[in-house]
Amino acid sequence: MAKTIAYDEEARRGLERGLNSLADAVKVTLGPKGRNVVLEKKWGAPTITNDGVSIAKEIELEDPYEKIGAELVKEVAKKTDDVAGDGTTTATVLAQALVREGLRNVAAGANPLGLKRGIEKAVEAVTQGLLKSAKEVETKEQIAATAAISAGDVQIGELIAEAMDKVGNEGVITVEESNTFGLQLELTEGMRFDKGYISGYFVTDAERQEAVLEDPYILLVSSKVSTVKDLLPLLEKVIQAGKPLLIIAEDVEGEALSTLVVNKIRGTFKSVAVKAPGFGDRRKAMLQDMAILTGGQVVSEEVGLSLETADVALLGTARKVVVTKDETTIVEGAGDSDAIAGRVAQIRAEIENSDSDYDREKLQERLAKLAGGVAVIKAGAATEVELKERKHRIEDAVRNAKAAVEEGIVAGGGVALLQSAPVLEDLGLSGDEATGANIVRVALSAPLKQIAFNGGLEPGVVAEKVSNLPAGHGLNAATGEYEDLLKAGVADPVKVTRSALQNAASIAALFLTTEAVVADKPEKAAAPAGDPTGGMGGMDF
């Protein structure tokens, strides 16, 4: 395919036009009085959202240079979303301000590499200042306030704080669509996985269609169990102990399954067979998690263990096991707390080293099942469009709350960024580097100005007033009052604020140092073929 090349100012201005097109669509959503954006979908109902990254992903521009500019800003929003879960609109607004100021200075003759170094040093200084000034999140109310700011809804904030209080900071909070109106919170105690009983005959509570085992032995097998002679020696020992048995294996089938079912129906011996969750290596890892949680061992040929020689000492135990047709819950496994803590540390290290979002998510789920618990927030709404929008807001708010617990909170509403500007005076930079630091100083006020503008206030006046207020005091755009924002519950996680600034500065530096852009040449659409009949073909007179 033929390429088109633009140089110097033409190249940078083309990229900037693309950036502005995207940023102008995204920044209207910033702040408590920000508006929504409607996204057309090829199939189904349109999506209504105020999430920066969702809007950015939908924007495709026609001009090749503008398209590249927009793609670069999408990267800012996506990276901020990946790292912090929120702050995508703030990152986009900061990127736009940094690029606008930077290009103005490049056009005036400043050296782009000098500006880049100045921007990087300034951003590092502001980041360190933000981390130092961050307040630790200690109370449920602080978590609720932070999540409520992200979701724009106090009830959602309170529900997320309640969920985090119950499952701990390591716990998993998932959001599901509900058929009923409003919000509900469901909590799971113990380890739950998405596999139920293999046969309905194992049910002990016919009304609830559940199999409940009190104080059972738990047999974990990495292979299929199909012949009864493999199981018999172990079954006899379990029957002598007078305890029920939960078998979790790749599969339980044939005569092994029918023997368990017959003994259950006759009342001789209570047991339940369940397929192990996951596939391949993930299944092995989850079985090992269960073994550590219940104080048992996985019967596997890899470690030289077989069912025929298995002893009761290899079995895990728990206070209670509840099995439905779809899921199994192990409550209060009898595993050693030090072994569980070691396994948790190992999974946490795997999360740190993983490059794949999917793997990270699955590891996080495993971590939660071992260390915390699982909370499900069920969201309902009047229409499907509203439901999708609400679910998205809750997911963002959950990640926001977790980020707040991780690194602490700073004053929200763009105030923390604006009031970080004085740290730039101590850098002692000169020449183009000092100009680069000044570009950052100007950009730091952009989020607050946009929030003020969206709230119908004069941006310049608000920024001037807030810069002269004590640290942490600023505009509460929801009420229009100037007050102590942390006390008023207007807070942002410092992880979100610093990620937005770092990612915006990274892309802005690339913009400024660009000297040529190579893009695909738009193909001209072929002219439609002429009709040999002169347009009269096929007509019946």
From Swiss-Prot:
GO terms for cellular component: capsule; cell surface; cytoplasm; extracellular region. Its main location: secreted. InterPro entries: Chaperonin_Cpn60_CS (IPR018370), Cpn60/GroEL (IPR001844), Cpn60/GroEL/TCP-1 (IPR002423), GroEL-like_apical_dom_sf (IPR027409), GROEL-like_equatorial_sf (IPR027413), TCP-1-like_intermed_sf (IPR027410). Its EC number is 5.6.1.7. GO terms for molecular function: ATP binding; ATP-dependent protein folding chaperone; isomerase activity; unfolded protein binding. Keywords: ATP-binding, Cell wall, Chaperone, Isomerase, Nucleotide-binding, Secreted. It holds the Pfam family Cpn60_TCP1. One of its GO terms (biological process) is protein refolding. It is found in: Secreted, Capsule; Cell surface; Secreted, Cell wall. Belongs to the chaperonin (HSP60) family. Forms a cylinder of 14 subunits composed of two heptameric rings stacked back-to-back. Interacts with the co-chaperonin GroES. PANTHER family: 60 KDA HEAT SHOCK PROTEIN, MITOCHONDRIAL (PTHR45633). This is Chaperonin GroEL 2. It comes from Mycolicibacterium gilvum (strain PYR-GCK). The gene is groEL2.
